[in-house]
Curated annotation (Swiss-Prot):
GO terms for biological process: tRNA N1-guanine methylation. Disulfide bonds: none annotated. The gene is trmD. It catalyses: guanosine(37) in tRNA + S-adenosyl-L-methionine = N(1)-methylguanosine(37) in tRNA + S-adenosyl-L-homocysteine + H(+). Specifically methylates guanosine-37 in various tRNAs. S-adenosyl-L-methionine binds at residues 113, 133-138. GO terms for molecular function: tRNA (guanine(37)-N1)-methyltransferase activity. Gene3D superfamilies: 3.40.1280.10, tRNA(m1g37)methyltransferase, domain 2 (1.10.1270.20). It is an enzyme of class 2 (transferase). The lineage of its organism: Bacteria, Pseudomonadati, Pseudomonadota, Gammaproteobacteria, Alteromonadales. This is tRNA (guanine-N(1)-)-methyltransferase. Its EC number is 2.1.1.228. Homodimer.
Length: 248
């Protein structure tokens, strides 16, 4: 997957290219990330990238010309099929379904705003989609962009050691993930569930699915409202609720 990022702070993206899953993906050629800094497209001796908003008010906006030129340069490098995304609180909220949709694109250009935002005309003429990572305010679009890159890259074939790792992640099937355990078998009087030590793969699968359903019911019940549960899932969830009521 090819990724371009428009940012005033390209150094921040070393967190993506140099570390963890995404760092290995870059090293192995599965993920290609390039940055364009609007400061490199300025024409004054101060490399000015902010400007006053019309109508007054607090704060500044990103200057139009350097930002637009940076986007054009990224488009030229990416090719015509690249999708330009602006990270914005007004955008569609990112969830796993959205991540799956974005992962189908082979080329993405992410525009990271700063200050109070960017000129609306840039959004109208240069941006294909707006996306948000949540209903809160951050200082810029870099952290949301890194969040999006990390989430999307996990779905690129070969990035994770086993595709099952992505398939078992929380939200991959609309459910929260099940509990996980490692050694020791007993920790401060808390034991690993016996089924996980049994070696019975089918029983382990059923336990994990039931725990995933139950955890979703308890922590994010609204997620279940959007799912059409299979007969197996409905039975497991009913058993979970029954056991929970007995232990109440």
């Amino acid at each position: 997957m090819w990724l371009g990022v428009i940012t005033l702070f390209p150094e921040m993206f070393r967190a993506v290219t140099d570390f963890g899953v995404t760092g290995r993906a870059v090293k192995n050629g599965l993920l290609e990330l390039h940055t364009w800094n609007p400061r490199d497209f300025t024409h004054d001796r101060h490399s000015t990238v902010d400007d006053r908003p019309y109508g007054g008010g607090p704060g500044m906006l990103m200057m139009v010309q350097p930002l637009r030129d940076a986007i054009h340069a990224a488009r030229a490098a990416a090719g015509e099929d690249a999708k330009v995304i602006y990270l914005s609180p007004q955008g569609r909220k990112l969830d796993q379904q959205g991540v799956t949709e974005l992962a189908k694109s082979s080329r993405l250009i992410l525009v990271c705003g700063r200050y109070e935002g960017i000129d609306e005309r840039i959004i109208q003429t240069e941006v294909d989609e707006e996306w948000s990572v949540g209903d809160y305010v951050l200082s810029g679009g870099e952290l949301p962009a890194m969040t999006m890159i990390d989430a999307v890259s996990r779905l690129v074939p070969g990035v994770l050691g086993k595709q099952a790792s992505a398939e078992q992640d929380s939200f991959s099937d609309g459910l929260l993930d099940c509990p996980h355990y490692t050694r020791p078998e007993s920790l401060d009087g808390l034991d690993v569930p016996a089924v996980l030590l049994s070696g019975n793969h089918e029983q382990i699968r059923l336990w994990r699915l039931q725990q995933s359903l139950g955890r979703t019911l308890l922590r994010r019940p609204e997620l279940l409202q959007n799912l059409a549960l299979t007969d197996e899932q409905s039975t497991l969830l009913a058993q979970f609720v029954e056991a929970m009521d007995k232990n109440a």
